[in-house]
Amino acid sequence: MVTRLSGEDGFVNDDIRVRYTRFSRGGVGLLVLEAMAVHSAKSGPLLRISSDDFVPGLSDLRARCHDAGPGKVIPQIIHFLKISRSGWRQTVDLLSLDDLDAIVDAYGAAAARARACGFDGVELHMAHAYTLSSFLSALNRRKDDYGGSLENRLRLPLRVVERVRREIGHDFTLGVRFVGDETIRNGYTTVDASLIAVRLARAGVDYISLSAGGKFEDARVIAGEPLYPYTGYSGDRCMPGSHYPDGANLYIPKEVRAALRAAGLSTPVIAAGKIGTMALAEEILQTEQGDLIGMARALLADPDLPKKWRAGKEEQVVRCVYGNVCKSLDENFRRVDCTLWPKKLGQAPESTDEIAPRWAENGPNLRAGTKSGAVVLQWDRATDNEGIYGYQVFRGEQGGVLVHRASVRGVSTRYEDARVLGGEKYRYAVRPYDLAGNRGAMSESIVVDVR
């Protein structure tokens, strides 16, 4: 996930250093820095690795991240096709053979810089709406050796892998992130994705990270604005929101991993896409749906999630609600923060060992009523030394387990749930949390019969 914290020049700055060292302190095993351009292109406030001028800043960022936490640190490198506010966008058929040679050279040089910076590896961005993904796409209809058949569509990405490996050697980690299901009309599915993964693994890729969608073909068109590839259905599938089930894209790593193993390849597969609970993450690993767990939004909400999971403090995790405010900020070219952070902080608060929030002696006095077909909850305020930041609301349906429904921020002690059906019974509970992410005790639950 990009941060849009870099300046227009693409250099590392203090905001970038603060953001990524915060992730490192949280205990991630592998920190993949946001996509940085391998070429000199106007890409807004995004990092670049397109010349040696960027090496000092990236080297410093790498060193700070290594000092801050135990995890490995690698950059994700990317090539963008051109787009304009008129709605025009460059497509793969407009690129000459010389252009393709230049793309291969740019990736090779950028990967060499990544090694010179002291990173632990490099990840090639071949996903979503960007150059290498557009060559892999089933919609790549070039009439030469770089389009049409799957073999031809793989030609440029495999040239990039070969060149990068030559530049970095075989003792430096090389990963690839690509789309396992384009989720667009006439796009490829996990069938092609499995074949792509096998070819990449045989070409010497050390791990494969899988995503979905994020394409220009179904993006919403707004007059006078450049296309943003995460506004259509494929964009929803790339970053599944609250209306999608947890692990909505897990069929992708499961099928691709199975194809790799059937081909006799042990290449690790990263599963990603709305994986926000330890139970789901453990299930993925134990049932061999993936070998590693990839997270973006969940870590943005709480960078200390890995540390809290290891310490058995999952109840203290500030859980992402998958409202995709972060995606909307990116779409509007604004710095990407999390709506769950304290206002004006600009960063996730540091976790502490302070005493958790407490209910008053007589408890939260949770009560409920109905209004215009909605359930209205109210409760008494909790107290905390650091100040209450908000409340988590949990709901269970038809006697089922309580699951996190929403977060109510600030001094409000009221929540209205309009997504209920008449004639059904729902069970609710609330829990306070403070500025440091500490969670108080959950209230006793109440049952509401919606009439």
Describe each model-derived feature in a short phrase.
Residues 354-386, 422, 435-451:
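Pro/Thr/Ser/Gly-rich low-complexity, intrinsically disordered linker/stalk tracts
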Residues 145, 365-367, 378, 392, ...:
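Conserved beta-strand positions that form and line the central face of beta-propeller blades
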Residues 390-423, 435-436, 441-442:
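Recognizes extended acidic, P/S/T-rich segments that occur
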Residues 1-359:
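Flavin-dependent oxidoreductase catalytic cores
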Residues 6, 83, 184, 385-387, ...:
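Residue-level signal for secondary-structure boundary sites
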